[in-house]
A protein has these predicted regions:
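Short amphipathic alpha-helical segment within the helicase RecA-like ATPase core
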Residues: 1-268
Length: 272
């Protein structure tokens, strides 16, 4: 999936090139769809009042918009995602709901979607943090590991716009962080999903070396080097394995001079 455009909320009916649009819907929401044209807003409000739209967290309602009914509306489909109670929404629940929306859109016949970002954010929360969580959840929602399947269900190449009243560099940063984080998590999931006879210490070491660049330095210690350092507890875990263990040391050095140092120690156990 790719981000191609960020739109201003005022231009929702004109500037978006997407063929569908997505709104969030809270239980106690009063002002529902005021940012779309009057006729479409009236229809959606009636559907909501009649109980045809679900605001339950994670529920998806799909509305088709024939021109004879939705006059002057530029989208062929409307996706409404339930967000539950306004004061209960947090990063994790929004991420989960966005994942549901992603899976629903993947199985539909639309190729692009415009997120009305303001409708997914409650006023009490940090707008940019929730925006990042929403995009992360949407991008991760379509993940599947089908490397070894004979019939692969390829991920749809879906383009999307983000419509927001807060168009600035902070929103750009939040969206870019979400894209980077989701891609990193997908790679981690791929590692975990590999079968044990494939993901050996050597393969995990190769993956780490491939990640290294000018800012990320990778050093791999083999059995003899670990033995020399007296790492007997570490070596004892792998003494029954056919393959010798590897200790992977990754060092991140940012371009800016930062005196703070943060250490993350992770454990990766492979089985043969």
């Amino acid at each position: 999936m790719k981000k191609i455009l960020i739109n201003s909320l005022k231009d929702i009916n004109k500037s978006s090139k997407s063929d569908s649009i997505a709104f969030g819907l809270f239980d106690d929401q009063q002002d529902l769809f005021s940012n779309i044209n009057k006729d479409s807003n009236s229809i959606l409000t009636e559907l909501n009042q009649s109980g045809d739209l679900s605001s339950k967290l994670g529920d998806i309602s799909v509305i088709y918009t024939p021109n004879r009914i939705f006059k002057g509306f530029n989208y062929s489909k409307i996706f409404i995602i339930g967000l539950g109670k306004t004061n209960k929404l947090d990063n994790n629940s929004l991420r989960s709901a966005a994942g549901n929306l992603s899976r629903k859109i993947q199985t539909s016949n639309c190729n692009s979607v415009n997120f009305v970002l303001d409708s997914f954010i409650n006023k009490e929360s940090n707008y940019f943090e929730l925006s990042q969580s929403f995009i992360e959840g949407f991008l991760l929602g379509s993940y599947s590991f089908n490397k070894y399947k004979s019939s692969k269900s390829s991920e749809k190449e879906l383009y999307f716009d983000v419509t927001s009243s807060k168009i600035n560099s902070e929103l750009d940063l939040s969206i870019n962080k979400a894209i980077i984080n989701s891609e990193a998590e997908k790679k981690a999931r791929n590692l975990v999903n590999e079968p044990a006879n494939i993901m050996s210490p050597s393969q995990l070491s190769k993956f780490s070396l491939d990640l290294s660049n000018e800012s990320l330095i990778c050093k791999i210690l083999n059995y003899d080097e670990c033995k020399k350092l007296g790492m007997n507890a570490f070596l004892g875990v792998a003494q029954g394995s056919v393959e010798e263990p590897k200790l992977i040391h990754l060092s991140y050095k940012p371009n800016k001079d930062d005196k703070r140092a943060t250490w993350y120690i992770g454990k990766a156990i492979t089985f043969d």
